[in-house]
Amino acid sequence: IILSVIYFICQHTGKKKIVASVLIFILCCGLGYSDSFAFWQKDLTYEGESIYNYLQVSETDRQVVLSTNVLFGVQSLYMKEGGLTGMYYDYAMAAPLMVPDKPVEDMNVLILGMGTGTYATQCRKYFGDMNIEGVEIDEKITELSREYFSLPEDVKVTTYDGRAFLQAVETTYDVIMVDAYQDITIPFQMSSVEFFTMVKDHLKDGGVMVVNMNMHGNKEGDINQYLADTIANVFDNVYSVDVAGSTNRELFASQHSDMIEVLSDHVENLSDAGLQNMMWRGADNSVAYAAGDYLMTDDKAPVELLGMQVIDQLIQEEVAYYKDIYEEQGISGLLEHL
């Protein structure tokens, strides 16, 4: 713009237009500037970036939400009153109740993909003073978990890759939660036979692994089938349950065969009615999974291609819905549904 102004001044033309343009430019710079990337979002509690993510924290009177996407995607949710979230964390709380012959308050729990610690916070609330530690690769998210999501200070969080952490420690756990799959971003090194074998080796006798898979698929050879088959080829007993109202699916795996029976016995003795109802729902909807031939290994784990296939399918389903409306009701009917 400076070069343009110099040019027109030298040509002795359009002086009034130059002055007006410069004033408008200055006015726009002063009034039109926003340091918020999501400029349409109001009243964000926090907005910033880390090495790995764009981060938003928003809150209401009831809850605090972390999102790592601008338009969509809730990565973590914390209920200020400490109740159930209605999300996959609630279903995953069945894992400690599947472990036989040990009080839940005495269990050691490891969370790979700690996020803001919602699962750890809920386990502490409902199961007592469990020994919980987490691994989270994004240190900024861990900082936010302490500041906004009430993660207890005595819950240790290591800033590290989940698989690298398992390679570095010899500790065994009663429950290992794998929650490192975000949207279509699935780390290949945490989706292979070799990785899940490593998880199994870090479980105590009777221990349970719970995996949060956040994309439903209903086609042969989709990403969920690859993950489930891979896990079922490592563990002797695998159960899955779909999370109501979302695309999440929880998968429970163990070497002991009485997971659901042990869960039912523990649920009968729960004192919290809300948690008890939630656990009964999970137990009733759990489906045994038999191993198939879709395997991912360190040498071949096409998670990006499989993830994009699911996204393409979701887009096609949405487009088909609106296409049917257009064909039946025309443009006016389509506009009414938007």
PLM-predicted stretches and their roles:
Residues 1-11:
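Membrane-embedded alpha-helical segments of integral membrane proteins
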Residues 13-76, 81-82, 88, 94-100, ...:
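Soluble small-group transferase modules, centered on the S-adenosyl donor enzyme superfamily
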Residues 83, 90-210, 214, 218-228, ...:
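The AdoMet/dcAdoMet-binding core of the Class I SAM-like
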